[in-house]
Structure formats: structure tokens, C-alpha cells
Amino acid sequence: MKINISYPATGCQKLIEVDDERKLRPFYEKRMSHQMTAESLGDEWKGYLVRISGGNDKQGFPMKQGVLTNGRVRLLLGKGHSCYRPRRTGERKRKSVRGCIVDSNLSVLNLVILKKGEQDIPGLTDTTIPRRLGPKRAGRIRKLFNLNKEDDVRQYVVRRPLPQKEGKKQKFKTPKIQRLITPQRLQRKRHMRAVKRRRYAKQREEEATYAKLLAKRKKEEREAHAKRRSSARESSLRESKSKA
């Protein structure tokens, strides 16, 4: 079985092949996200704490969290599920996945180092791969460089150097900062608030005008109704007098 071990602190990962069944036996019957020591892999792994993050069986089917079996099952998967990427909106598909319990039928087991041990592992903990991209959001740049609200974030953006051409000046690529508070943004915010206040005042004024007009129409309707009733009463009185 192959074991793919990653160390997020350095950004490195290493694939090792383990043929000895006794070294792999402590991992059997363990679930995904289970934390355990890696001392069974050898003396150089003494003190290391790892987490089982997944794996693939010999036919390439991935392990899926939450499927409590060590075999293969067919599940109806949709958007938001692991082990499946929908090609169309609302598309669902029945896919074969392996359960979250480790057994001997896996070809690759994925581990993540949570705690470093006593010795360094060559190619995993002794080297550091720098991140290609820095933070893009203004709040995260402030958090990275411990800046205040008064400091200018634009001076602290991580610029990525582009491949230099012969006889040309070195160029850098700067990401666009998101959620950056600028005078234009504050002015736009003030403008939107003023527009909202004017809209609210206009709405109140229109409501008051409509209420006055409605009261006037209702008053006119009541007066017309009273006039019709009085004229009908007078005509009925005249008819009764003429019959008498």
C-alpha cells in the first residue's frame, strides 16, 4: 500500500510505499478523520501525530466521509457532495464510492501530519515550499502584517514576480485588493445613504398626499350618498302625499 503524507506547515507532501503488513495493521478498522500516532511506520516517525484524511482503493474509487463501511457502495450524489462534481445545474448521478473505514483493499492512504515528531523526514519536514499567492482580502492582509486601520494596505500586497525576459525590466503581478476602504467607496456609501433618505422622504410625502386625496374622495362620496338618500326620502314623501 502507498501512503501519501502531507505536512501543511511546510506545504510539502511525500508518497511512500509500505510493503510490510505489520506496519499497516494499526491503520486498519480506523475511520476517516481519526487521529493516531505514526510510530508503526518506522523509528523516524516517532512522536508524529497524523490524521486519516482519505484514500483510494485498487480500482481508483475514493473514500467518502460518513459511509460507515469498508466496502464499496453506489450513492446518488449531487451538488455539495464530496467525490462528485456536477456538470449541469441540478444534475445528480449515482456514483461508486468506498466507505470511510480503512482496510487492506486500499491502494493509497492519505495522512495529514498534525504534530511533528523528534526527527525530520527528508523532503517533508526539512524543506519549505513558499505559497505562490498571498492574501487578497484587505482584512487578511492586515491580519498577516499586524496592521491598524490607519495603515495603507496597498503597500503590503504580496507581489508575484513574472518570468523576466532578456533585456527587459523585471515585472511583478499585483492582485486586486478586495474589500478595500477608499475615499471613493466612502463617498459612494454616503451617496447611497442620501439617495435612500431622499427616497424615504419622497415616499412619506406621496403617502401623505394620497391619504389626503383618499380622505377627500371618501368625504365627497359620503356627501353624495347623503344627498341621494335625502332626495330619495323627499321623493317618497311627495309620492305618499299625492296618493293621499
UniProtKB/Swiss-Prot annotation:
GO terms for biological process: translation. It comes from the Eukaryota. Residues 185-244 are annotated as: Disordered. InterPro entries: Ribosomal_eS6, Ribosomal_eS6-like, Ribosomal_eS6_CS. It holds the Pfam family Ribosomal_S6e. One of its GO terms (cellular component) is ribonucleoprotein complex. Belongs to the eukaryotic ribosomal protein eS6 family. Component of the 40S small ribosomal subunit. Plays an important role in controlling cell growth and proliferation through the selective translation of particular classes of mRNA. This is Small ribosomal subunit protein eS6. It comes from Branchiostoma floridae (Florida lancelet).
